[in-house]
Curated annotation (Swiss-Prot):
It holds the Pfam family Ribosomal_S15. InterPro entries: Ribosomal_uS15, Ribosomal_uS15_bac-type, uS15_NS1_RNA-bd_sf. Transmembrane segments: none annotated. Belongs to the universal ribosomal protein uS15 family. It comes from the Bacteria. It comes from Roseobacter denitrificans (strain ATCC 33942 / OCh 114) (Erythrobacter sp. (strain OCh 114)). One of the primary rRNA binding proteins, it binds directly to 16S rRNA where it helps nucleate assembly of the platform of the 30S subunit by binding and bridging several RNA helices of the 16S rRNA. The gene is rpsO. Keywords: Ribonucleoprotein, Ribosomal protein, RNA-binding, rRNA-binding. The keyword rRNA-binding applies. SUPFAM superfamilies: S15/NS1 RNA-binding domain. This is Small ribosomal subunit protein uS15.
Amino acid sequence: MSITAEEKARVMKEFATKEGDTGSPEVQVAILSSRIATLTEHFKTHKKDNHGRRGLLKMVATRRKLLDYTKAKDEARYQDLIKRLGLRR
């Protein structure tokens, strides 16, 4: 249900703003998006996993807050991020 260390490192490298960047909103949103995609696949086969679904909803809310923060601080970075992640909006 979680992403592997290699997948997480790949996402961090792709979305990092500088070397060693792990905490920027772009990286955090990208990691959350990867975890959300993994959990979405999990729920296709495990429909009754309501405890896991709660965790998914918390991740979606966290991602939404980070996206709102990014949009408030820098609209261009926000537009670039949602385009690179393929998020609708």
